[in-house]
Amino acid sequence: MNKNYNLSKIIFNDLISFYKTQLILIFMIFISALLIITIIHKTRLLTSQQEELDIIKKKQMPLNLEKYISTSRLKFKHEKIDT
């Protein structure tokens, strides 16, 4: 009278009956980690695309305008605001 038990089924039933909240929390942590990775990846792609557009715009910019922008940025960096 050997009775065969399906161990994986027993473990699964125990997990569902006794550890529901822990399983839900682990699942939510896993989902949030995947979402964070996806958001970071998309943000980096958008940043690199923006940098490429800036490079293209800079190449198309006339030299006089480029000098004006660089000198005006320097002026704003060194100005002090009195309060």
Curated annotation (Swiss-Prot):
Subcellular location: Cell membrane
Segments on the Extracellular face: 42-83
Transmembrane segments: 21-41
Cytoplasmic membrane side: 1-20
Entry membrane topology: Single-pass type II membrane protein
GO process terms (BP): cell division
Annotated keywords: Cell cycle, Cell division, Cell membrane, Membrane, Transmembrane, Transmembrane helix
GO cellular component: plasma membrane
Pfam families in UniProt: FtsL (PF04999)
Top-level lineage group: Bacteria
Similarity comment text for this entry: Belongs to the FtsL family.
Protein's job: Essential cell division protein.
Protein name: Cell division protein FtsL
Organism: Buchnera aphidicola subsp. Baizongia pistaciae (strain Bp)
Lineage: Bacteria, Pseudomonadati, Pseudomonadota, Gammaproteobacteria, Enterobacterales
